[in-house]
Swiss-Prot record:
InterPro entries: ATP_synth_csu_bac/chlpt, ATP_synth_F0_csu, ATP_synth_F0_csu_DDCD_BS, ATP_synth_F0_csu_sf, ATPase_proteolipid_c-like_dom, F/V-ATP_Csub_sf. Signal peptide: none annotated. SUPFAM superfamilies: F1F0 ATP synthase subunit C. CDD domains: ATP-synt_Fo_c. One of its GO terms (cellular component) is plasma membrane. The record marks 59 as: Reversibly protonated during proton transport. It is found in: Cell membrane. Keywords: ATP synthesis, Cell membrane, CF(0), Hydrogen ion transport, Ion transport, Lipid-binding, Membrane, Transmembrane, Transmembrane helix, Transport. F(1)F(0) ATP synthase produces ATP from ADP in the presence of a proton or sodium gradient. F-type ATPases consist of two structural domains, F(1) containing the extramembraneous catalytic core and F(0) containing the membrane proton channel, linked together by a central stalk and a peripheral stalk. During catalysis, ATP synthesis in the catalytic domain of F(1) is coupled via a rotary mechanism of the central stalk subunits to proton translocation. Key component of the F(0) channel; it plays a direct role in translocation across the membrane. A homomeric c-ring of between 10-14 subunits forms the central stalk rotor element with the F(1) delta and epsilon subunits. Belongs to the ATPase C chain family. This is ATP synthase subunit c.
């Protein structure tokens, strides 16, 4: 295989595998937040605020994977 093909394959794997974890995590987080709101509707504001903050933290992992894949394509 040529070096360019290997670089593109590595970048694709880095982004694909780096996005699986945050995707699953955000799904579980949303499920838990909706269950909590269903049990205690008065706490909706607090639960929603915490959920948005944690979703941002989870998605930062996917952004790091994107940066790594871009570095693999253009720098390595």
């Amino acid at each position: 295989m040529e070096a360019d093909v290997i670089k593109l394959l590595a970048a694709g794997l880095a982004m694909g595998l780096g996005a699986i974890g945050p995707g699953i995590g955000v799904g579980i987080l949303g499920f838990g937040a909706l269950q909590a709101i269903g049990r205690n509707p008065e706490a909706k504001g607090s639960i929603f605020t915490n959920m948005i903050l944690l979703v941002a933290f989870a998605e930062s992992i996917a952004i790091f994977a994107l940066v790594i894949s871009i570095v693999l394509i253009f720098v390595a």
